[in-house]
Structures are given as C-alpha cells and as structure tokens.
C-alpha cells in the first residue's frame, strides 16, 4: 500500500488511486474524465520516476533535508494533496466544484506545469555516482584533523564542574573495573547529585487559587508529583511542599494547568549530597565502557575529561587515541586515525609501504598486532552504526593489562547490543540534570549576561531545557538578558521562549546545540522522519508526553503506515534511536529541545502548523497559508489559542486536526476535507458537541479517524452513521453505556476501541463491520459475553477481552481466519471452542504476561469440519475443547481436551478427531486395550498426550515399541505413576511429566532408559502430598537411579510442589557424585568486595537452562563454569 511522506506528500497514494480510477471497476467513467486522469497519471509518474532514485539510492541526511525544503518539491507536495482531495471527493460522487468542465481541469494544468519544470531542472536528473577520494601514502605523514583533537579541545569549563561526580565514577571504572558478572549490573544510570528529600517553594498569586472553600486542593494536585509528600503549607501566595522524589517539572506543569500561573521560588536539599560508593570487584574488570545519553547531555564532555585526566600520567596507559565519528564516517579514515594516534606507524614491525587507499583489513591487522601486548585507552566518540563499531572493535585487541575502550552513543539500540554481545562491556547512562542542578547551572550562566537580576529568568529556561547541560548553557546565555528586560510580562516571556522553540536553527548562539540535535534527525531514514514529525504537535509545557497507542493509530489514519505491526516496529525504532524515552505504561517522553527541532523542521516543510500557548496570534493568523502553494494541511491547537483567529485563517484544505488541552468552540464547518479529528482527553467535549460533529456531514464526509478518548461524552448519537468513511473510532475511557445499532452502518470501520467504558453488551450489528481488524472491549467488567455475530468479522486480526467477565467465547471464533492476537488475560476463559483449532497457524493467545502468547494445537481444518454430519457437529462441542489455562498455569501450547470424566475415549473422538496433534483425557480407571491401541496407532499426528486417572492404577501401563511414533511430550496424572516403558518405546519423546498425589511405595522400574530422545523429566506434586511422601519419594528415587544409566546424560529432573517450582534440581551426568542442588531464591554468589550478588539460575529461565548445565555442587558454586556451560 502506497504511503504518504514528508518529502513527496501524497504523490505515491495519488498514483495508486488514479490506477484504481482507471481500472475495471470504473468502466463507465466519462471519456473526458478518463482522458484527464490518464494524462495526470503519466505526468506524475514522470515526476515520481525522477524523485524515486534520489530518495531510494543513498541520499545523505542533508540532501533529504534540502529535498524537503526545495521550492519546486513543495509545489509537488501541495499539488499531490490537492489531487488526493479531488480523487477522494470524486469517488464519493460529490465533487466540490461545479461547472461544465471535468473534475480535474484545474489540477491538470498545474500538473502539466510542475512536470515540465521538473524535467527541465538539472537538479532532478539521475545522480551521477561519485567516488570517495583516495587516501595517499602522504596521509600517513600528515595526521588527519581528528588526530589533532587533543590540542584543539573546545572550552568545556561550563560543563566540567557539573560533571565532576560523573567523572569520578567513570575514572574508577577505568582504573579499577566493575562487576560485569551480573547482567543487570552492567547498566548503570549516572549517580544522582542529590538525595530524594527536598523542600519545594512555589509562588502563585493568591487571586489565582480560586478555592476559598477547599484549601486542600493544591496539596491534592501536588501529591502526584512526589514519590512521597510528607507535609505542606499554604500561606498567602506561597506554597511550601516537603517530600521525597519531587518531580519539579511535573509539579509546575500541574499547577499551571490548574491555576494558570506558578513560579518556582526555591528548592532546598534536606539531606547531604549522595556520596559515590563504587568499589573494585573481584569478578571481571570492565574492558569496554559505553557512555549513553541524549545529544547535549555531556557524553563527549565526560569522554574528554577522562582523556585529559590521563594526559599527564603516561605510565598508566602506554598508548591513547580519541576519534570522533559522524553518521557518514569513512571507516578507512577512522582506522588510519587510530593507527596514527597510538603510534603504530612508527613501529618497525608494521610498516606501511603501499600507495593509494590502505585496505581496512590491513589497518585492522596492524593496529591489533601493535596493541596486543600494551596497555591502551581508546575512545570512540559518537557511534552511529553497530556495523561500524564491529569493524573498529576488531582492530582493538582485548588483553589482561588493564586496557580500556570507551565509546559514546546517543542510540539506545547500540548500548543494548553492546551489553548483550560483549560480556566485558559496561553501559553508563548519563541522565538529565535534576531540577536543582539545572537551575544552578542556568543561574551561573545567566549571571554572566545579567549583572542585576530583578527577576530570575532561570525557572522558565530550566523548564524548557529539561536538564540538558548544553541546552541550559546556550539558551541561558541567549535569553537571560531578554527575559530580564521583559520584567514580569508573562505573555512576552512566553513569546521569547516560543521563538527559541519555533526558530532554534535561526538563533546564532544556539547553532552548536541545534547542529548537535540535527545530527540525529539527519541520521533518520525518510519514513522515520515522516513519523517523527507527527510528534511536533506535542509541547514541552505538557512534559512532551507521547501516548504510544494514540500516536501509532494516528500514523495509520494519516496514511503514513498501512499496518499496525509495522507502525509498532517503527515506534520501537525511534525509541532505540533515542528520540523517545519510556516513562511508564503507554507513555513516552520527548526532550523539549528535540521537540524544538521537530517544530522547526515541521514548519520548514509545512508539515504541521502548531498554534497555542506562547503563539503570536497576529503573526499566526496572517501567515501566507491562503497561498495556493502553502495551505494548512495539518493543524494542532493547544490551550490558550483564541478561536477568533479562525476568521482570518483558511482551513478548508486541512486534513488533520489535533486538539491538545481543553479547547472548545472550534468552527468545524470551516474544515472541508478533514480526515483526522483527534479530541482525546478534551474534557470540554460533551454529548451535544459530538452530535453536532456528526451532523456536519459536509465537513466530515472524508473523516477516517475520530478520537474521543477521555472526553465527557456519555453516548454515541444515532448520527454517527453519517460518518460513512470512518475507519478508526476511539471512545475508550468515556461514559458511554451502549453502542447504538447504527454502529453497523460504519462499513469502513477497521478499529473499534471501547475499553474502559460502561458498555454491558455488544449489539448484534457488530457483525456488519466486515472490514474490522481490531476490536478492543477490555477493562469492562459489565461485559460477560460476546455475540455470535463476531464470527462474521472475517478480517478481524486483534480481539482484546482482558479484564472482563467473559467466561467463554462463541464457537464462531474459529471462523476468524485472519485472527492474530486473542487476549483473555484476567477473564474466566480457560478453554476455547475446538473450532479455534482452524486458526492454529496464525493465532497467539495471551493468558499471562508473556509477550509471545500461546499457540494453539494443530489438527482441525475446514475439511474435517465438513466431514462431520450436522447432527453430530453440535455434540462435538460437548466433548471437545482447547485447554489454554491449566491448574498449573498456561502451557506453552494449547491442547485439545476431552471434556468431562470418561470410562473410555468418546466415539466422536475416535470417529472424527484421530488427526489431532494433542489430546488431554481424564478417565475413571485404567486405560483399556482398545483405547491404548487407538492412541498409539490410530492417531498418527499425536505429539502431546495427557492421561489423567481418578482411580489408583493397580497394574502399570505398558508402552512398547509399536505406536506413539510422533509423540514428544507425555504427561501422566495419577496417585502414583504406574507406567513402564519397554525398549524402543516412544522414540521421539523428549519431555516426560508426572503429576501424582500419594500411594504405596514401589520400586518397580519405569524404564526411562528406553526413551532414547528423552531430555527432561518433571515431577509435579500436589500441595497436599509433597515430594517427601514415601510413595512419591520412592518413584522419584527410581527415576533418579535410571537417569544415571541413561545414554542421553545429563537428564534434567525438575520437581514442583503446588503451583511453584521447589528448590530441588538435579541434572544427571554420570554415576558419581550425584547430589540434589538446593537453588533457593536466597542462594546467590556474593562478591566479598562490593557485596553484589548473582543468583546462579535466574528466575523464569530455569526450565531452559537446566538441560545445558551440569549442576554438580562444586561446579554450581563457580559462576564462571556455569556461565561457560
């Protein structure tokens, strides 16, 4: 599916729609219209063919940026959007313009003009391949610019003082190493500068409080901004709060939302500064340190400080090198840089005698050979690509001489991979400065610009810079004097800050900061730029908070991504690149300075127009958006923007309207081509507003997305049926109590989200939504069942019923052939209809917190169902289901379960279900011979079998070499496991499991030595009859004895009691020195120096790790050997 782009606008979708218009479905198209459409398509295809190679074939970040800003390219985008509007309106048979001419007459002329200008322009001709300049031998005699880095360091004195704590911590890592044996301990967030407990003083004009009858309101509002609010006082206009873990930014944002004005007066620490306490550890020394942080957070500064720290102590490191990379770095130059700085070119053993460009492998081999026996410090600054780092890493040999490698990066994905792939790596994450430190730094810089400060401008600047040192320094020096001159004119102060936000690249003093931030933006591929620019609607006053689900869905509605799975992947990619940081649940945050870059870029490309707090309304209203080449395509309104300005604005071409905050009175009738209307969390929206929205058919006939989450609506009006093109409807977290039957009229609906509402049942008309892909009814305890019509949703991919009162699902669920995700967590659903086996190949069922979900067993297909007589088909649901939740939790794969207690296998199962891949059956008594024969030889696909016996077994079940040829998992539940395996039995069995209660002791052999493929034996004991019961203990002893003789040593033994694993784990690898290992949660390996501990077997992974570990006691106590095995 063609998608929209920040560079080409709607060009690709328009070409796709024109092809559809000229297809067989529109054979009755008027001749003139068909002729115009063919002409326009041919002209636009020519333009697209010139653009596509440049976009697809390795354009640099700067070239893509120039492409987006190009005047002719801007005309192409605007033309494509107008063309897109015209085609959509034509499909609806409601063209906007009347007259005798064709619907595309005006656009035809514009298309012809733009196409001609494109073809005549030299700029858009196919690019000529350029070769990298060669590196001559003379390069070796003249060190490149990076080699002179140490002698040309920029003055970082402003940051040095603020980073002393981080410097001390990293120096200890360099000199002493740290514990890398524990996976989690190899990622440390920078030590905080202050302890948690603080006293915060906020000043708000008394007239603004507005709560004479309730003086507790400010304390209630403030409580969410503290981990623990201990006390507070309100005296006049001064609010004093004492507590732990204060989030100052959130506190000020909350108070400003409630009362309009709030200024921080003072923050006092009530405890001493936290002392750094890193001690050397006896496990491993850190070989590699990865410093992770946002641009401007001080990564490079820390690296420079470390490099300088050792500049006078040459005996510590024999050789040093500091190399800075860029997104498009030349690796050959980088390796040459390292070679020169460490002095390898002076070594007689590795002379360079070639001419031209040295081969990378030559450089790698020579650097490695030179450093192999030496103590070195290598710093690689600003790593962008993991592949580049791997090449550099190959040239730097590891040794035991105390050498260190330091890399800095802004990409979370690289830091994660560094820790995962290198056991000797340590990730050191530099966090933003806390509010107090940020204020101190800002105040220090501001006082250099303003000698006498009547008011302190730092509070607003600190809010905006959010702890980024470089931003604090640059913005403080740029704005302190201006804000001081404005005295207490709050509106003008906001405008000054807004100028930084909207024009960060235009202010000379902010250029170093802007360039650093733009590096990350220029590094993004085009599709990620498009998606990221959608975030420019968010504002730093609201914390830059991004709701993941809201943003992803809007991407899809806007046409930037076609599939939800792809959109989720792109979101994760942006997180991995450091643009967003996970905050909690579904919330992420973007740093205000990054938002400023996005705002600027968005304005440059005319991508999103943002109007709201701090805007100059006169300027905003008079922008040349009425120009035919610069229409408002996407509009975001934020609190504080006056509605009267709409009278001078043309929003008839606006495709998307996002409203953040309580903005009401928007004249929606002025929006003629709206596709996206996002009103989420706007508490000013009530039932009357929604009804009016639905009645404005003229304005909203193209509407695809309607977001009403968190509004005050209590019902969906009947007029909702007028939104015929609606594809996404979000009404979650509202007060609606029912879905009207008119919901069935929304034939194009793809996503329906009604979670966390008061709805008690779904109407049968839900089955008319033939294009529905996502249905979310979670968090609604009033819902107890789903209608059978749900089986008519043939394209449904996601069904979420978690946290509801649903206990069973309709059998029609098996007809949902495209269902991919079924979430039944925290419901009464324990089994699925057997018909669900039809979708076993694609469906993942979520019954617990596992991300992967459970797969369903195979065996049921459409042909099987057709072969069952109708008279018997209904009875099948009485004897067969799919078990997804066992008393012991969720199995890794569902299993077909014979419902009830039986004396023999039901006839229906034998007649129609011999093709099943699994079976779970509960019997009164022993397994009769004919049933044994059926299971062993008449179920050729059987891979998992569960036999449960109510009565004690007097004689053992004999399993011989015939039958069960495909069985891999076998579970027997009885009082005692009376079963014997003969030679050659169950040749593919890997997992054998017993669940028993109590019975007389027996030393009869079980015969597990005959199970040639066996890997694991599990004993599950009832919580009433534990493993020390004589009968159970005797059976376990028999298995232990046979395990010693099994050719597949080691065989893993796992014992559980009740619903939990017990600390009895034994892996049998020989007949000598067999002991039971007690791996209790408290048992851990402890470092005598630092006291850190490491559990030998991590919780949740014991099942996977046991088979690969030989856990004899001497080895168990050695972390190193356990890790190697």
Curated annotation (Swiss-Prot):
<dbReference type="InterPro" id="IPR003591">
    <property type="entry name" value="Leu-rich_rpt_typical-subtyp"/>
</dbReference>
<dbReference type="InterPro" id="IPR044974">
    <property type="entry name" value="Disease_R_plants"/>
</dbReference>
<feature type="repeat" description="LRR 8">
    <location>
        <begin position="818"/>
        <end position="841"/>
    </location>
</feature>
<feature type="repeat" description="LRR 7">
    <location>
        <begin position="794"/>
        <end position="816"/>
    </location>
</feature>
<dbReference type="Pfam" id="PF18052">
    <property type="entry name" value="Rx_N"/>
</dbReference>
<keyword id="KW-0067">ATP-binding</keyword>
<dbReference type="Pfam" id="PF23598">
    <property type="entry name" value="LRR_14"/>
</dbReference>
<dbReference type="InterPro" id="IPR032675">
    <property type="entry name" value="LRR_dom_sf"/>
</dbReference>
<feature type="repeat" description="LRR 8">
    <location>
        <begin position="873"/>
        <end position="898"/>
    </location>
</feature>
<keyword id="KW-0547">Nucleotide-binding</keyword>
<feature type="repeat" description="LRR 5">
    <location>
        <begin position="747"/>
        <end position="769"/>
    </location>
</feature>
<feature type="repeat" description="LRR 6">
    <location>
        <begin position="771"/>
        <end position="793"/>
    </location>
</feature>
<protein>
    <recommendedName>
        <fullName>Disease resistance protein PIK5-NP</fullName>
    </recommendedName>
</protein>
<dbReference type="Pfam" id="PF00931">
    <property type="entry name" value="NB-ARC"/>
</dbReference>
<dbReference type="GO" id="GO:0005524">
    <property type="term" value="F:ATP binding"/>
</dbReference>
<keyword id="KW-0611">Plant defense</keyword>
<dbReference type="GO" id="GO:0051707">
    <property type="term" value="P:response to other organism"/>
</dbReference>
<comment type="function">
    <text>Probable disease resistance protein. Resistance proteins guard the plant against pathogens that contain an appropriate avirulence protein via an indirect interaction with this avirulence protein. That triggers a defense system including the hypersensitive response, which restricts the pathogen growth. At the opposite of cultivar Kusabue, the cultivar Nipponbare doesn't recognize the effector avirulence protein AVR-Pik from M.oryzae.</text>
</comment>
<feature type="repeat" description="LRR 3">
    <location>
        <begin position="701"/>
        <end position="723"/>
    </location>
</feature>
<dbReference type="InterPro" id="IPR055414">
    <property type="entry name" value="LRR_R13L4/SHOC2-like"/>
</dbReference>
<feature type="repeat" description="LRR 4">
    <location>
        <begin position="725"/>
        <end position="746"/>
    </location>
</feature>
<feature type="domain" description="NB-ARC">
    <location>
        <begin position="282"/>
        <end position="564"/>
    </location>
</feature>
<dbReference type="GO" id="GO:0043531">
    <property type="term" value="F:ADP binding"/>
</dbReference>
<feature type="repeat" description="LRR 10">
    <location>
        <begin position="989"/>
        <end position="1013"/>
    </location>
</feature>
<dbReference type="InterPro" id="IPR027417">
    <property type="entry name" value="P-loop_NTPase"/>
</dbReference>
<comment type="similarity">
    <text>Belongs to the disease resistance NB-LRR family.</text>
</comment>
<dbReference type="InterPro" id="IPR002182">
    <property type="entry name" value="NB-ARC"/>
</dbReference>
<feature type="repeat" description="LRR 2">
    <location>
        <begin position="676"/>
        <end position="700"/>
    </location>
</feature>
<keyword id="KW-0433">Leucine-rich repeat</keyword>
<feature type="repeat" description="LRR 1">
    <location>
        <begin position="651"/>
        <end position="673"/>
    </location>
</feature>
<keyword id="KW-0175">Coiled coil</keyword>
<dbReference type="InterPro" id="IPR041118">
    <property type="entry name" value="Rx_N"/>
</dbReference>
<keyword id="KW-0677">Repeat</keyword>
<feature type="repeat" description="LRR 9">
    <location>
        <begin position="939"/>
        <end position="966"/>
    </location>
</feature>
<feature type="region of interest" description="Structured coiled coil (CC) domain">
    <location>
        <begin position="1"/>
        <end position="273"/>
    </location>
</feature>
<dbReference type="GO" id="GO:0006952">
    <property type="term" value="P:defense response"/>
</dbReference>
């Amino acid at each position: 599916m063609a998608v929209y782009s920040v560079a080409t606008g709607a060009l690709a979708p328009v070409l796709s729609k024109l092809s559809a218009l000229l297809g067989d479905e529109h054979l009755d198209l008027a001749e003139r219209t068909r002729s115009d459409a063919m002409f326009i398509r041919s002209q636009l295809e020519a333009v697209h063919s010139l653009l596509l190679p440049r976009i697809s074939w390795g354009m640099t970040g700067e070239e893509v940026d120039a492409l987006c800003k190009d005047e002719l390219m801007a005309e192409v985008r605007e033309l494509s959007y107008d063309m897109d509007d015209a085609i959509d309106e034509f499909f609806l048979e409601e063209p906007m313009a009347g007259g005798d001419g064709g619907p595309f007459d005006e656009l035809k002329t514009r298309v012809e003009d733009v196409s001609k200008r494109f073809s005549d322009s030299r700029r858009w001709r196919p690019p000529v391949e350029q070769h990298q300049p060669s590196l001559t031998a003379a390069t070796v005699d003249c060190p490149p610019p990076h080699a002179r880095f140490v002698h040309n360091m920029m003055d970082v004195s402003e940051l040095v003082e603020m980073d002393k704590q981080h410097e001390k911590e990293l120096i200890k890592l360099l000199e002493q190493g740290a514990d890398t044996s524990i996976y989690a301990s190899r990622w440390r967030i920078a030590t905080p500068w202050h302890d948690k407990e603080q006293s915060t003083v906020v000043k708000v004009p008394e007239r603004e409080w507005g709560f004479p009858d309730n003086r507790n309101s400010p304390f209630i509002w403030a409580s969410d901004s503290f981990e623990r609010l201990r006390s507070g006082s309100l005296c006049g206009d001064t609010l004093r709060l004492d507590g732990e873990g204060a989030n100052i930014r959130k506190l000020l944002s909350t108070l400003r939302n409630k009362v309009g004005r709030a200024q921080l007066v003072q923050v006092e620490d009530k405890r001493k500064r936290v002392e750094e306490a890193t001690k050397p550890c006896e496990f491993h020394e850190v070989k590699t340190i990865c410093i992770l942080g946002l641009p401007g957070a001080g990564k490079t500064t820390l690296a420079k400080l470390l490099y300088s720290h050792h500049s006078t102590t040459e005996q510590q490191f024999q050789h040093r090198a500091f190399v800075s990379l860029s997104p498009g770095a030349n690796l050959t130059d980088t390796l040459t840089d390292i070679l020169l700085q460490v002095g390898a070119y002076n070594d007689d053993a590795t002379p360079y005698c070639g001419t031209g460009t040295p081969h990378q492998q030559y450089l790698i081999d020579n650097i490695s050979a030179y450093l192999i026996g030496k103590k070195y410090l290598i710093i690689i600054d600003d790593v962008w690509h993991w592949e580049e780092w791997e090449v550099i890493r190959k040239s730097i040999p590891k040794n035991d001489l105390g050498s260190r490698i330091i890399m800095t990066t802004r990409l979370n994905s690289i830091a994660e991979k560094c820790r995962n792939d290198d056991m000797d790596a340590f990730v050191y994450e530099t966090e933003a400065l806390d509010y107090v430190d940020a204020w101190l730094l800002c105040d220090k810089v501001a006082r250099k610009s303003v000698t006498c400060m009547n008011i302190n401008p730092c509070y607003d600047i600190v809010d905006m810079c959010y702890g980024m040192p470089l931003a604090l320094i640059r913005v403080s020096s740029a704005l302190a004097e201006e804000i001081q001159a404005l005295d207490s004119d709050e509106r003008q102060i906001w405008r000054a800050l807004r100028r930084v936000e909207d024009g960060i690249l235009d202010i000379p003093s902010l250029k170093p900061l802007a360039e650093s931030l733009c590096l990350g933006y220029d590094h993004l591929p085009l599709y990620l730029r498009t998606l990221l620019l959608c975030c420019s609607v968010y504002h730093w006053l609201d914390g830059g908070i991004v709701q993941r689900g809201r943003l992803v869905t809007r991407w899809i509605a806007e046409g930037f991504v076609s599939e939800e799975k792809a959109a989720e992947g792109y979101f994760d990619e942006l997180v991995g690149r450091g643009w967003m940081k996970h905050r909690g649940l579904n919330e992420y945050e973007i740093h205000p300075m990054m938002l400023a870059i996005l705002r600027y870029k968005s304005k440059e490309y005319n991508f999103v127009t943002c109007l709201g707090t701090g805007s100059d309304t006169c300027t905003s209203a008079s922008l040349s958006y009425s120009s035919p080449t610069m229409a408002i395509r996407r509009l975001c309104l934020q609190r504080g923007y006056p509605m009267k300005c709409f009278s001078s604005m043309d929003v008839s071409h606006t495709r998307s309207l996002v409203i953040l905050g309580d903005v009401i009175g928007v004249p929606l009738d002025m929006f003629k081509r709206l596709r996206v209307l996002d009103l989420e969390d706007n508490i000013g929206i009530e039932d009357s507003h929604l009804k009016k929205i639905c009645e404005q058919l003229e304005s909203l006939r193209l509407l695809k997305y309607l977001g009403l989450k968190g509004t005050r609506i209590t019902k969906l009006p009947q007029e909702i049926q007028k939104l015929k093109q609606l594809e996404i409807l979000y009404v979650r977290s509202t007060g609606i109590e029912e879905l009207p039957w008119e919901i069935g009229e929304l034939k194009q609906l793809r996503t329906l989200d009604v979670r966390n509402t008061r709805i008690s049942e779904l109407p049968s008309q839900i089955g008319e939504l033939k294009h529905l892909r996502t249905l979310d009814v979670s968090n609604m305890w009033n819902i107890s069942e789903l209608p059978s019509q749900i089986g008519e949703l043939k394209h449904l991919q996601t069904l979420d019923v978690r946290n509801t009162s649903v206990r069973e699902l309709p059998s029609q669920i098996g007809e949902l052939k495209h269902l991919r995700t079924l979430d039944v967590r925290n419901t009464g659903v324990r089994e699925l209809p057997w018909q669900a086996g039809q979708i076993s190949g694609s469906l993942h069922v979520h019954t617990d917190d596992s991300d992967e979900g459970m797969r369903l067993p195979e065996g049921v297909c459409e042909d099987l169902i057709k072969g069952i007589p109708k008279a018997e088909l209904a009875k099948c649901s009485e004897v067969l289901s799919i078990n997804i939740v066992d008393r012991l939790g969720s199995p890794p794969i569902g299993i077909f379960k014979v419902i009830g207690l039986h004396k023999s296998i039901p006839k229906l199962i034998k007649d129609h279900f011999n093709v099943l891949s699994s079976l779970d059956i509960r019997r009164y008594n022993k397994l009769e011979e004919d049933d044994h024969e059926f299971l062993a030889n008449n179920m050729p696909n059987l891979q998992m079998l569960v036999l449960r016996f109510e009565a004690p077994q007097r004689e053992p079940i004999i399993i011989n070499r015939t039958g069960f040829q495909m069985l891999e998992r076998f579970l027997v539940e009885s009082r005692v496991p009376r079963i014997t395996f003969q030679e050659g039995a169950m040749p593919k069995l890997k997992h054998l499991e017993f669940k028993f209660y109590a019975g007389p002791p027996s030393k009869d052999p079980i015969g597990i030595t005959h199970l040639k493929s066996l890997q694991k034996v599990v004993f599950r004991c009832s919580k009433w009859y534990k493993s020390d019961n004589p009968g159970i203990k005797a059976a376990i002893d028999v298995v232990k004895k046979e395990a010693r003789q099994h050719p597949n040593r080691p065989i893993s033994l796992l014992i559980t009691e009740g619903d939990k694993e017990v600390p009895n784990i034994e892996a049998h690898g020989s007949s000598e020195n067999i002991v039971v290992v007690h791996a209790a949660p408290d048992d851990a390996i402890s470092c005598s120096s630092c006291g850190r501990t490491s559990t030998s077997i991590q919780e949740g992974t014991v099942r996977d790790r046991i088979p690969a570990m030989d856990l004899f006691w001497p080895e168990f106590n050695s972390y190193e050997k356990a890790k190697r095995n």
